[in-house]
Amino acid sequence: LDAAWYKSNATRQLLDLPMDPFSGYASRKINAGNIQNEGLEISLNGTILDNPAGLSWSSTAQFSLNRNKIKELYEGVNLYDIKTFDAIQIVAPVGGYYGEIYGQTFMRVTDENSPHYGKIVVGDDGLPLISTEKSKVGNQSPDWMMGWTNNFSYKGFNLSFLIDFRIGGSIYSATASNLYTRGNAAGTVVNGDRAEFVVPNTVVQQGSGYAENTVAVTPQNYWERIGSTGNYGLPEVYTYSATNVRLRNITFGYEFNRQMLKKTPFQRVRLSATCNNVWMIHYNLPGIDPESVAATNTNATGFENGAAPTSRSYTFNVTVGF
């Protein structure tokens, strides 16, 4: 068992600050900021089974978590824009954490004394109203990650596999927004029908108060309203948990014993087959791999838009020794 806890501050980061376009430049580079990194790493490995019959099983688990807190940026700057995708921003706010996802949300009852506190406000047409202010809808960083490797051996045969756990964090899916807005997502059909419905947990404003909403809407009108915020739809709805558990790779091999190779010129022969990106055991983003992010030239990994799916690969190996 190995465990390590760390805490460090990275200062004078290279930042791009926006400038007045009339200056002739879009931004300027400065050295500023103070980001505090705090985390924990644990590694546990051992032999679980090693019997005289030749069967052995060894296992290794590696756990990690990390928090990047923004202590300060630059005088007069309280929020650094890592990347903006239309109405969605991935930012680093002072007092918050690196990679927070900001965007618009449903308009809700904010009076804590109201019996309808927290409910979505709709218009007279029964469709939800959208807030004009941006607020936090998630963070791209996982709460914790773990890799679990297992290795089994028996009389020349070997089987090993790695399971990856990425728990927590969020990702905005513009792909899901496009599918729902156009009625191509399974969620736009309930029990094989697109019947009118009353948006659940909603109220309509009446004078200085609110009343339960009873106005039914069509699925088409509802999803078009949700998709009308910018080009990518309402961030609150299309920000999903990025939690996923996957069988990352598996390898099966066989090594011939030397007795079998006595009449050959080989000292060693091993055959093996490997498959990578084998099986998505659990995920929350419908039909999309959370690792399929929209951009590769930025640290903003909490956004995807029609990205190509991650590939599955197969490898066959023959290893010989003379």
Predicted segments with their positions:
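Extracellular/periplasmic, surface-exposed regions of secreted and cell-surface proteins
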Residues: L1-V94, G230, L234-F322
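Short hydrophobic/aromatic-rich motifs at helix boundaries and adjacent loops
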Residues: R12-D16, G118-I120, Q220-S228
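Conserved small-residue
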Residues: I30, L40, L49-Q140, I171, ...
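Conserved SET/PR-domain catalytic core that frames the SAM/AdoMet-binding pocket
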Residues: T60, T132, P142-G156, R248-G253, ...
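Short, highly charged low-complexity linear segments
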Residues: G103-F106, D125-L127, E224-T229, A307-N317
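Short, flexible active-site loops
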Residues: T132-E133, W144, F157, G230-Y238
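Glycine-rich, aromatic-lined ligand/substrate-binding cores of catalytic
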Residues: V137-A174
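Extracytoplasmic gating/loop element in the C-terminal half of outer-membrane beta-barrel translocons
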Residues: G168-R270, C275
